Amino acid sequence: MPHILIKTWFPPHKADEVANVYMEELKSHRPDRSLGKSLATSIKSDQNGIVSLEIFEVKEGKLEEVLTHYHDVQIMYHNIEGFRYEIEVWRTPVEALALLGMKPPE
């Protein structure tokens, strides 16, 4: 099962605005458990502002639905000046080995 990493950045002075949209997101856009599950959500600050990272484990055959869901969620933040995001698909080690025609020992 692949993992989706959703990383966002925003300026500290926009934190209240982002938090308000996030509260709305929690009410209206949580992914269906049939798509997978969130493994972790973390927040920190760095030289680029405030950064959040979510790791979502995708159930087999649900990748496109999950990507659509997270792109729809990020659209909620588009009017916040300075808000940026990145969505990445990461493979598990087993999936990466399969691309090479290999599998781990049992």
Where does each model-flagged region fall?
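Charge-dense, low-complexity polyampholytic segments
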Residues: D72-Q74
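Short S/T/G/P-rich N-terminal loop/turn motif that feeds into the first structured element of a domain
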Residues: M1-H69, V89-E106
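Conserved short beta-strand edge segments in small beta-sheet-based binding/regulatory domains
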Residues: M76-R91
